[in-house]
């Protein structure tokens, strides 16, 4: 079939370019399902006919964006493979599987010659990616011979349903249409498509549409599970690379080294083309940022010229964190970008009111309409028109994209001699070498090179080092030397075998973004986390070395991560791995508890335990409500944060009353269930569940609560003498702060140093005790200054006694200064009091390690980890999130030590 098609094309391409007929039925349907002529362009208002290649209409029986139609991932793949079978311009590859075993694919589209020689073209981009192995002359020849590659991905976020439909039509159009516009794309570039990123969630979303069609007039269950572990956060995995979808897309990147990676999303109206408001990540090359803007404004201009309303850029997203999927491109010297197209979730036509974004702004002079009748086909038209213009821009600037790719790679390896630093060095003699092994593993998955030194290394990390003459000229320095017979040397010594991440490698900017310390001003508007310094999150030692002499030290490139430590410290993640892998150890019976409100944050906990080889049962709040004796089945219950804006009452009461919202596997919904099932998502924990968990703790169990579930435990009385403090001015959006151990002999904190990096995100702020904090009183108005005592006249002065400082463990439980006997009935016994194991640093100016922090005085000294006894058991409360997005391995042992020692916490 392909040979016949190729022969026809060679014989008649000129005629087709002039006279190619349209598929009239398909073209009529495009116009029927588009709600306004201004929501179409000449690029997508038709579809050419083909005698040999099937359209989506011929294959599926409906067009892309048709009312009432959504396509399962497997059916999208069947169509793409039908194109592969029918056209020599299309080739389909398998990328890998999801956690539930569903396939992810990659579709390559170009002209016949390019597809036939695809390996040659991807070898060109691979060679251009590493300037260390290529002469300037050879690079120029490769740029002249090569073709840039544009990689677009769809359906990462499962409720965003339009992109798989659109990408099927786009693939057909690129393979079949013979207009000069499309032929230029096909002849000059390679287009790569992954039509469905989150395949598990896509199929669940289509199931819910089928349910909605069969059950009109009643609410449709919310999409509580997207992927097997997480939902929207699948676009926050580009640091940890813990999800299959992230690793599959990374594989596609390294297979082809595309010059653009473009994620297709759906939210705000009508089409937002990413640039961002800033702050931009400081590791990014200015050339890359300039290219973002050039491409975005080109598409905004071209679509606005064609009469489309509501196409804009700038005023959404920031450009700061490297955790988004399109950073797979940006971290590897390619352009990363995304669209946000207006969507209805369902394949229905809806009357929508647009507020806020329909207002004209300097960055949005052509705003969306304030009221609109919006269809799925409108969504397809906007996405496809924009993407076609982007592809055409690459085709017209073929050499520019390859040249920029090469130039960005060259500038990356020049980093040590330009802006620096030269390297990041991780000492070999780490206390938590298992955590370091995890960090190195992540870097290598990103393609970042890590070396091991062949000998010990002593170096001044600063650059340039001070000259002896300059030191002698400094009188103060000379005086200091005279007073200190052993002045401190600026040099740092690293043992043989220490690990070096060199900055003279192609992906130095990604390594720098992940390893350096972040600072964000409090007035900046941020979109997500602000601090992610990997060495802090994994609690390992490192040194940022600006001195380029470090690059002259003999070292070997690591082919694989180092071996796991044989005897890991208790604060090393390998400790839990070895404990649960050892058949001789006593294993606790563990349950992870989830609500039916939201499962994303707890999904990261499931993934964390699985990564450590820890077995667990997965139960819902409804299960606990029906389980009077939880202790009979479990020793430890982990209740991860619910997330979003959930409050304690929501956990107990569940969703609003109404018709049942089933989440289960049926003939109609074969992809629901599996992870967990219920006949009705509405009921919550209920007061019976609160009682059952209270009994579980009293009977000797350990309940671990985090953030909002810690507040729930406080609000519903599972924990006594702990309060949540309202916020006034604190701003810490995804920030790494410094914590201090207050109890060093607890099994929970075993192996930790006196200070520990903690990941904290705005709330909660907790305090312990039975009385309000006694604040220092100011003096009354009188003589003297603010610090002078007030002296009554006519008698000798009697000073006010100094307040007695509370003894360790009595903070918040100190009796009143006067008539303490009146308070005795209300004072809990020492053995019943909650113990603060870890606090936030007590000095506000010492709190911030990485990210944004304002109003830190509200956080300073407050509890971060509390162990509250109750009966024979305990509730462990975290104000921080110790298992966040598979990045915070340095905090995992605070959870796992408690789990392992659940019956030894007294």
Where are these regions (language model features)?
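Positively charged n-region of N-terminal signal peptides that target proteins for export
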Residues: 1-4
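Intrinsic-disorder/low-complexity accessory segments
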Residues: 18-190, 230, 236-237, 242-248, ...
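Mobile, glycine- and charge-enriched loop segments
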Residues: 191-243
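Short, solvent-exposed turn/loop segments enriched in Gly/Ser/Thr/Pro and often Arg
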Residues: 196-199, 209, 264-271, 709
